[in-house]
């Protein structure tokens, strides 16, 4: 493996091998990360990286596209079958690119949008002032109820009536509960707004029937193709007949040039994998593991935003521990447990410190771990957060983590990916 790269650029080869070792020997609990199958990685590392293919299948600006046309058409058909939509655009390079394409297709600069507050679990591309969405549009925000930690739909409706937005965004990057897309469509219809569902985090759960689908409620749906969907890093737009033409044009030539055909091939493979029965079993186990891990963390005396989880992630409110999210992240890193610092609702700390950490189960579930392993992981996390400066203890836990991980290989070490 990597023999050509090692001969050409040994520095890069060494760094890749060290990263592979990190993934192999540690627990990946970042909610947005996962492991692709070997099949997806092979598609991405193929000769398709050499091919330009501006346009859509059958309507390219370059010759020699007969094979990449077939690949992209398969990706489109599989995406539509997986999510139950009539149209899909598989070309966005990322979830952010998918959102940019939707905004530029459906909005004019200065139009009003209503999105979820970033510190309440939203995403940068839903109106953050440091992002294009916050610079180009008139943004207002909704959030979660201070007592329950769950979306306050009554407040959302009140704000929508007051500002009459052109677009309401649903979906989040750090929200552990079910999103009521039907209720959000009712609110959107009441004020004459369009509804966009960004399901980047929950796409795999939606595809497997483990989270209510926005199809039939949202006017347009965006997602990434990694995270719970377990594909390559990329974006996807799903839509009906009403907006297909303008959304396709907004991707190309509106916001992108040539598509990444090697990534689209990886998407097609991942969509095919997600259509198999074992993917439904995998998605169900993600949620079972998340519930077990959440219960284990609370048994350690830790506080979870909203008191638990309905999906693949949970937010730990660290204020009772005296640690910031950044401090907790560093301590857990030393114990070979990877999480990310994350804001909690109305967080008093700045974004680079935060008062919370976000934890998710997609990656450890891909490795085949189940509820007993979640109980052990919760115990390790509790111990690290109680003794974050005890280097000997952290080193011991890192060794125990490595021992556990040897029994649950990552896909690169497998002949076949576990379900």
Swiss-Prot record:
Catalyzes the reversible interconversion of serine and glycine with tetrahydrofolate (THF) serving as the one-carbon carrier. This reaction serves as the major source of one-carbon groups required for the biosynthesis of purines, thymidylate, methionine, and other important biomolecules. Also exhibits THF-independent aldolase activity toward beta-hydroxyamino acids, producing glycine and aldehydes, via a retro-aldol mechanism. This is Serine hydroxymethyltransferase. It comes from Chloroflexus aurantiacus (strain ATCC 29364 / DSM 637 / Y-400-fl). Its main location: cytoplasm. GO terms for biological process: glycine biosynthetic process from serine; tetrahydrofolate interconversion. InterPro entries: PyrdxlP-dep_Trfase, PyrdxlP-dep_Trfase_major, PyrdxlP-dep_Trfase_small, Ser_HO-MeTrfase, Ser_HO-MeTrfase-like, Ser_HO-MeTrfase_PLP_BS, SHMT-like_dom. Homodimer. Belongs to the SHMT family. Signal peptide: none annotated. Keywords: Amino-acid biosynthesis, Cytoplasm, One-carbon metabolism, Pyridoxal phosphate, Transferase. One of its GO terms (molecular function) is glycine hydroxymethyltransferase activity. GO terms for cellular component: cytosol. PROSITE patterns: SHMT (PS00096). It is found in: Cytoplasm. It holds the Pfam family SHMT.
């Amino acid at each position: 493996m990597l023999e050509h790269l090692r001969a050409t650029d040994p520095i890069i080869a060494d760094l890749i091998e060290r990263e592979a070792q990190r993934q192999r020997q540690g627990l990946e609990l970042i909610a947005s990360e996962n492991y692709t199958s070997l099949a997806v990685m092979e598609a991405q590392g193929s000769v398709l990286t050499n091919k330009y293919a501006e346009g859509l299948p059958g309507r390219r600006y370059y010759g020699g596209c007969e094979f990449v046309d077939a690949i992209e058409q398969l990706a489109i058909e599989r995406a539509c079958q997986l999510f139950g939509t009539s149209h899909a655009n598989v070309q966005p390079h990322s979830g952010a690119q998918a959102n940019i394409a939707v905004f530029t297709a459906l909005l004019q600069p200065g139009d009003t949008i209503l999105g979820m507050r970033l510190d309440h679990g939203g995403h940068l591309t839903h109106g953050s002032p440091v992002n294009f969405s916050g610079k180009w549009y008139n943004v207002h925000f909704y959030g979660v109820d201070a007592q329950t930690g769950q979306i306050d739909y009554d407040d959302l409706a009140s704000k929508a009536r007051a500002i009459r937005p052109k677009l309401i965004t649903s979906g989040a990057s750090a929200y552990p509960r079910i999103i009521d897309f039907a209720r959000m469509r009712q609110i959107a219809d009441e004020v004459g707004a369009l509804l966009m569902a960004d399901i980047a985090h929950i796409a795999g759960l939606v595809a497997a029937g483990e989270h209510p689908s926005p199809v039939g409620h949202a006017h347009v749906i965006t997602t990434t193709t990694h995270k719970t969907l377990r594909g390559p890093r990329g974006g996807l737009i799903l839509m009906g007949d009403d907006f297909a033409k303008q959304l396709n044009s907004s991707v190309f030539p509106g916001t992108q040039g040539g598509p990444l055909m090697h990534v689209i091939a990886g998407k097609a493979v991942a969509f095919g994998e997600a259509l198999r029965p074992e993917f439904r079993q995998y998605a169900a186990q993600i949620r079972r593991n998340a519930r077990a891990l959440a219960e284990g963390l609370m048994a350690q005396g830790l506080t979870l935003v909203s008191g638990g989880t309905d999906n693949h992630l949970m937010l730990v409110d660290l204020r009772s521990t005296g640690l910031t999210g950044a401090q907790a992240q560093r301590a857990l890193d030393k114990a070979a447990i990877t999480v990310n610092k994350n804001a909690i609702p109305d967080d008093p700390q700045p974004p680079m410190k935060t008062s919370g950490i976000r934890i998710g189960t997609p990656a450890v579930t891909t490795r085949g771990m189940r509820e007993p392993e979640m109980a052990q992981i919760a115990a390790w996390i509790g111990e690290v957060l109680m003794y974050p400066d005890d280097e000997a203890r952290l080193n011991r836990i890192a060794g125990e983590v490595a021992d556990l991980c040897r029994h649950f290989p990552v896909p690169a070490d497998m002949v076949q990916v576990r379900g």
